[in-house]
């Protein structure tokens, strides 16, 4: 009987102890949750660190600087190419201007050649003709004037690079000579060379502007 009473008392003590522990846990749990919740709210309400903002701004500036540097390099390359193209255009234009300056008077010189032919023939006729005594002085003056005019024209031609071609004895060249006819080769005349010049040719700075009208010597059996 006493043993049963002791067992009942011990069991009651264990039940009371377990109930007290459960109750204490119930009281502690709400306080723990509230503490955690308050700590979380406090952490979330705090401002971000001061160094975070400037770091992002600095990174953005660096990226922008790299982009601008690439653009500068690209523009510099384009500028260099443009300068090179302009220099090439300037050189080509300069060559064209020089060519125009040299050969721009080609047509003018070609027209003057006809005048030179007339003056030369007139001067030759006046010097060889037999005229009456009363006209001799006048003809002498005319001849002197024509001679001076011819000399002046030759001086102008030389100044502008106009050269007269009298290719007697030269080998026939279709780029410089206009073949009028063939004639038998005389003594000392090589076949295929110019035997007679009907009309002188002219060159302007080495470029033929008028072919010389010539007769070319050939062997007797090949006469045309």
From Swiss-Prot:
GO terms for biological process: protein folding. SUPFAM superfamilies: Coiled-coil domain of nucleotide exchange factor GrpE, Head domain of nucleotide exchange factor GrpE. It is found in: Mitochondrion matrix. InterPro entries: GrpE, GrpE_coiled_coil, GrpE_head. Residues 1-31 form a transit peptide. It comes from the Eukaryota. One of its GO terms (molecular function) is protein homodimerization activity. The keyword Chaperone applies. GO terms for cellular component: mitochondrial inner membrane; mitochondrial matrix; mitochondrion. Signal peptide: none annotated. The modification N6-acetyllysine is found at residue 141. Keywords: Acetylation, Chaperone, Mitochondrion, Transit peptide. Essential component of the PAM complex, a complex required for the translocation of transit peptide-containing proteins from the inner membrane into the mitochondrial matrix in an ATP-dependent manner. Seems to control the nucleotide-dependent binding of mitochondrial HSP70 to substrate proteins. Stimulates ATPase activity of mt-HSP70. May also serve to modulate the interconversion of oligomeric (inactive) and monomeric (active) forms of mt-HSP70. Probable component of the PAM complex at least composed of a mitochondrial HSP70 protein, GRPEL1 or GRPEL2, TIMM44, TIMM16/PAM16 and TIMM14/DNAJC19. This is GrpE protein homolog 2, mitochondrial. It comes from Mus musculus.
């Amino acid at each position: 009987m006493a043993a049963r009473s002791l067992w009942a008392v011990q069991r009651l003590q264990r039940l009371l102890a377990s109930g007290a522990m459960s109750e204490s846990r119930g009281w502690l749990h709400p306080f723990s949750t509230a503490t955690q919740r308050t700590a979380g709210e406090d952490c979330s309400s705090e401002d971000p660190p001061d160094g975070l903002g400037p770091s992002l701004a600095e990174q953005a500036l660096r990226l922008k600087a790299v982009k601008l540097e690439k653009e500068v390099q690209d523009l510099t390359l384009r500028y260099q190419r443009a300068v090179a193209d302009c220099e090439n255009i300037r050189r080509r234009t300069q060559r064209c201007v020089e060519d125009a300056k040299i050969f721009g008077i080609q047509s003018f010189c070609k027209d003057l050649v006809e005048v030179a032919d007339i003056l030369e023939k007139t001067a030759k006729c006046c010097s060889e003709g037999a005229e009456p005594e009363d006209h001799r002085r006048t003809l002498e003056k005319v001849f002197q004037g024509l001679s001076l005019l011819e000399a002046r024209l030759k001086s102008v031609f030389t100044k502008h690079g106009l050269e007269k071609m009298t290719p007697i004895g030269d080998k026939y060249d279709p780029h410089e000579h206009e073949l009028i006819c063939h004639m038998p080769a005389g003594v000392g005349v090589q076949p295929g060379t110019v035997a007679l010049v009907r009309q002188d040719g002219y060159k302007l700075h080495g470029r033929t502007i008028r072919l010389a009208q010539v007769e070319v010597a050939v062997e007797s059996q090949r006469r045309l």
